[in-house]
Amino acid sequence: MLPSIVISIVLASFVSAESSITEAPTTTAEDNPYTIYPSVAKTASINGFADRIYDQLPECAKPCMFQNTGVTPCPYWDTGCLCIMPTFAGAIGSCIAEKCKGQDVVSATSLGTSICSVAGVWDPYWMVPANVQSSLSAAATAVASSSEQPVETSSEPAGSSQSVESSQPAETSSSEPAETSSSEPAETSSETSSEQPASSEPAETSSEESSTITSAPSTPEDNPYTIYPSVAKTASINGFADRIYDQLPECAKPCMFQNTGVTPCPYWDTGCLCIMPTFAGAIGSCIAEKCKGQDVVSATSLGTSICSVAGVWDPYWMVPANVQSSLSAAATAVPSSSEQSVETSSESAESSQSVESSQPAETSSEQPSETSSETSSQQLSSITSAPDSSATSSSSTTSTFIRTASINGFADKLYDQLPECAKPCMFQNTGITPCPYWDAGCLCVMPQFAGAIGSCVADSCKGQDIVSVTSLGTSVCSVAGVNAPYWMLPASVKSSLSVAATAVPTSDSASETASQEPSETSSEQPSETASQQPAETSSEESSTITSAPSTPEDNPYTIYPSVAKTASINGFADRIYDQLPECAKPCMFQNTGVTPCPYWDTGCLCIMPTFAGAIGSCIAEKCKGQDVVSATSLGSSICSVAGVWDPYWMLPANVQSSLNAAATAVATSDSASEVASASESASQVPQETSAASSQSANNSVASAAPSNSSVSAAPSSNSSGVPAAPSNNSSGASVVPSQSANNSSASAAPSNNSSSAISESVAPSSYGNSTIAQPSTSTKSDAASITGPITTDKVITNESGIVFTSTVIITHVSEYCDQTSAAAVQSSACEEQSSAKSEQASASSEQVKVITSVVWCESSIQSIESVKTSAEAAHKTEVIASCASELSSLSSAKSEAMKTVSSLVEVQKSAVAKQTSLAAVQSSAASVQLSAAHAQKSSEAVEVAQTAVAEASKAGDEISTEIVNITKTVSSGKETGVSQATVAANTHSVAIANMANTKFASTMSLLVASFVFVGLFI
């Protein structure tokens, strides 16, 4: 009994030590693309593992689904993460092994394997510990004790074999095997039963009971798994056979009807069946026995093709070694029937004709040359043509790949973007690979094909052309789903390409480029030559990033669900930039060219230590304390959402150490002085913020004029100047800019030496209850006194990187100033609200740590009291005294921890109140923007203002939800009766946790000594 108490305390300590993991922040904004990520629903009724299979589970297994997901680092809704956690899977598996027997165990484990396979987990899909797996295997062979052991099974003889035997010959002897194979399963069974009426009902019942195949759980239309792009959840024969059956030689078709029940796969899961040697071996042995020569090559090529399309790695179709040997021997054998040989050659001729007709560069349209090409293709070509999808073929509706190509699957998608020197290199022979000529992903992973292209490019191109070709190759292979390094070039070819990339092109190509560029520029935009040309040249010279090739609308790559093929900064930075601390934002502009990733590929950039290390080192250098924690948490969050595995954001060890050190450092005194300067009198604000006003105004102008292109606001002397709103701890500020007569025509808004006045007042509050006042009458009249319209310059960069500078004429000056001023107030309030959210999240995280210490203290107190009771019974006064001392220390630590919990709860309440008031500020400012926009009579201004109103409303809705969450935390945290502690609870809670750890060490030594002593005494 006593040793078990020691073990429980040790386990509790391990749990408390691991509870310091910072969870990735959750986002619920409607415009956040992650909230509609297609393959993971962010909620669950039970948990992400149980929800989708609960209704199909046996009754005995259903109570086992309600296990605690808190023992894992996974979100409770994340199916894939829960599947690979042995702690969670083991708890469910142990429960099933205990409560279920026989077929119920098989059904439950098959469903678990199925849902984990659908979620994208690798073999063995559901990660159950070995001892639990043994228990499940034993339970699966046990006989159920229930009296409901199916009477129907015993009363109905096993007609399953009879049904299978009767259906197989019928399909083989049929004059139209393709139609039979593509019909529905129910149709086939009905035809068989009509031929053998006596055994129809037993066969149907027995096959249902004896089969170990569990079909995929049915799901409603709004479940994202029902639109999972690459796997159809049904099959006529099975997931392997359906898509290639019509293209198989006649001798191989009967081999497709193997039993999928010998695998843990759902019968429709192509990828799972491809990697199961038991299933692949049965098919391969049958083909080796029934087929010879070219028929074996065709069948194995089709098998490799379908497995490659399903995303399986090399060698794609996992056939056992002995079966592979049999297939190789059969492929070299000569068919015994001359009729079979003639039939095979005619099919090959038809295949070669279709391939030739799709090649644009060939001149085989004349009748005489067609006959010769047929003959040569029969003798030399070992390429298996792409399956022709027809109206009766099931593959025409389930495939996610285009089964044809003009050149080949690799070249088609990038040919138009290639430099001229590289285009001839694309016409390499795909016959040296086992790939279908149209399969981009398969061709990407074949070194012999990639090496031929790479060697040709290295010989034909130099300098920037090499970089463009390799970037395009990497891009198209990444889009095709190939893992890093995407385009599998041999090492020797990579070296040749690297050397060629550093070489300087000859003068002929340089002069040709120089002669083409000016004429092209002058013909497009004569009035903007000066601003376009430098931007174009610099972007072409400095950028090594090549965007993904554009593809037609019917190409499935254009609707690839989880990756946007463009980015403003890069795929890592775009989605978290607005939430980052200011100190970390400059760190996002690292060069993606040091990686093989497309610049827009979030997941790829997350796993590249060179890119992640550069960002991490910059953050460690520029940020301190909570800013470091926020930045790294956002990085982990975006990488987790992109599907990267733990630890999500792959930082090098030395950079991680630097970030840990920076996270514990205290921010410098600059921030304190900045706060102090912001709280000075209103008369000093214009002089202190004149430089900042210009920058803020430029941002306001950019936001007031929406466009499809990105807007780059650069501070200049002729930009409008509107000051940003003061922070919540300032006493109020009034900025009075004006404009002199000398520069009234060139400035968008007044500077400090002009004559007009625009004022804005913000009332301070302890919780940030700031309110915005409408511009006064005198302000409007002063702004209206400006004669005539004013102008401002707007700098726009389009998608091609060309910079335009346009002039905006502002006629409603007063309303324009009101709108930009209100936009600045809303922007400031939004930033302060984000800061309050961060403060709340930090306090919540610290509260979890302290509550963990409280729980540990309570557990330790109970254990020591038990030891003390035993010592009192044994009259061991020394042990009793030691226990009393430890109980006093632990009680003191628990009391301090409870005070800290109360303090952290108050901090969170304060942060929520602050966010609520700032949401009101945003709403008020948005109303001012909308009113001013309507007064301007500008549709663009109204659209921007309406967006601001929507954002302000959304901010208020989010705050309401968070208040409910905080209220629940307070009630569960036992707020009543706890005295108020200091608000700066960060250091205090860490001290409490450290003290608890120290007490744990001393208590453990006391407990071990006491247990040994009491045990010897007894």
Swiss-Prot record:
<dbReference type="GO" id="GO:0030446">
    <property type="term" value="C:hyphal cell wall"/>
</dbReference>
<feature type="region of interest" description="Disordered">
    <location>
        <begin position="677"/>
        <end position="785"/>
    </location>
</feature>
<feature type="disulfide bond">
    <location>
        <begin position="421"/>
        <end position="461"/>
    </location>
</feature>
<feature type="disulfide bond">
    <location>
        <begin position="255"/>
        <end position="286"/>
    </location>
</feature>
<comment type="function">
    <text>Heme-binding protein involved in heme-iron utilization. The ability to acquire iron from host tissues is a major virulence factor of pathogenic microorganisms. Required for biofilm formation.</text>
</comment>
<keyword id="KW-0408">Iron</keyword>
<feature type="glycosylation site" description="N-linked (GlcNAc...) asparagine">
    <location>
        <position position="753"/>
    </location>
</feature>
<dbReference type="GO" id="GO:0046872">
    <property type="term" value="F:metal ion binding"/>
</dbReference>
<feature type="glycosylation site" description="N-linked (GlcNAc...) asparagine">
    <location>
        <position position="698"/>
    </location>
</feature>
<keyword id="KW-0677">Repeat</keyword>
<feature type="disulfide bond">
    <location>
        <begin position="265"/>
        <end position="272"/>
    </location>
</feature>
<keyword id="KW-0449">Lipoprotein</keyword>
<feature type="compositionally biased region" description="Low complexity">
    <location>
        <begin position="165"/>
        <end position="221"/>
    </location>
</feature>
<feature type="glycosylation site" description="N-linked (GlcNAc...) asparagine">
    <location>
        <position position="798"/>
    </location>
</feature>
<feature type="glycosylation site" description="N-linked (GlcNAc...) asparagine">
    <location>
        <position position="708"/>
    </location>
</feature>
<feature type="disulfide bond">
    <location>
        <begin position="60"/>
        <end position="100"/>
    </location>
</feature>
<dbReference type="InterPro" id="IPR008427">
    <property type="entry name" value="Extracellular_membr_CFEM_dom"/>
</dbReference>
<protein>
    <recommendedName>
        <fullName>Cell wall protein 1</fullName>
    </recommendedName>
</protein>
<feature type="disulfide bond">
    <location>
        <begin position="274"/>
        <end position="307"/>
    </location>
</feature>
<feature type="disulfide bond">
    <location>
        <begin position="74"/>
        <end position="81"/>
    </location>
</feature>
<dbReference type="InterPro" id="IPR052505">
    <property type="entry name" value="Fungal_Heme-Binding_RBT5"/>
</dbReference>
<feature type="glycosylation site" description="N-linked (GlcNAc...) asparagine">
    <location>
        <position position="718"/>
    </location>
</feature>
<keyword id="KW-0732">Signal</keyword>
<keyword id="KW-0349">Heme</keyword>
<keyword id="KW-0479">Metal-binding</keyword>
<feature type="binding site" description="axial binding residue">
    <location>
        <position position="601"/>
    </location>
    <ligand>
        <name>heme</name>
    </ligand>
</feature>
<dbReference type="GO" id="GO:0020037">
    <property type="term" value="F:heme binding"/>
</dbReference>
<feature type="region of interest" description="Disordered">
    <location>
        <begin position="147"/>
        <end position="227"/>
    </location>
</feature>
<feature type="disulfide bond">
    <location>
        <begin position="444"/>
        <end position="477"/>
    </location>
</feature>
<feature type="glycosylation site" description="N-linked (GlcNAc...) asparagine">
    <location>
        <position position="729"/>
    </location>
</feature>
<keyword id="KW-0134">Cell wall</keyword>
<feature type="lipid moiety-binding region" description="GPI-anchor amidated serine">
    <location>
        <position position="989"/>
    </location>
</feature>
<feature type="signal peptide">
    <location>
        <begin position="1"/>
        <end position="17"/>
    </location>
</feature>
<feature type="glycosylation site" description="N-linked (GlcNAc...) asparagine">
    <location>
        <position position="965"/>
    </location>
</feature>
<dbReference type="Pfam" id="PF05730">
    <property type="entry name" value="CFEM"/>
</dbReference>
<keyword id="KW-0472">Membrane</keyword>
<feature type="disulfide bond">
    <location>
        <begin position="425"/>
        <end position="456"/>
    </location>
</feature>
<feature type="compositionally biased region" description="Polar residues">
    <location>
        <begin position="767"/>
        <end position="785"/>
    </location>
</feature>
<dbReference type="GO" id="GO:0005933">
    <property type="term" value="C:cellular bud"/>
</dbReference>
<feature type="compositionally biased region" description="Low complexity">
    <location>
        <begin position="509"/>
        <end position="553"/>
    </location>
</feature>
<feature type="domain" description="CFEM 2">
    <location>
        <begin position="223"/>
        <end position="334"/>
    </location>
</feature>
<feature type="disulfide bond">
    <location>
        <begin position="606"/>
        <end position="639"/>
    </location>
</feature>
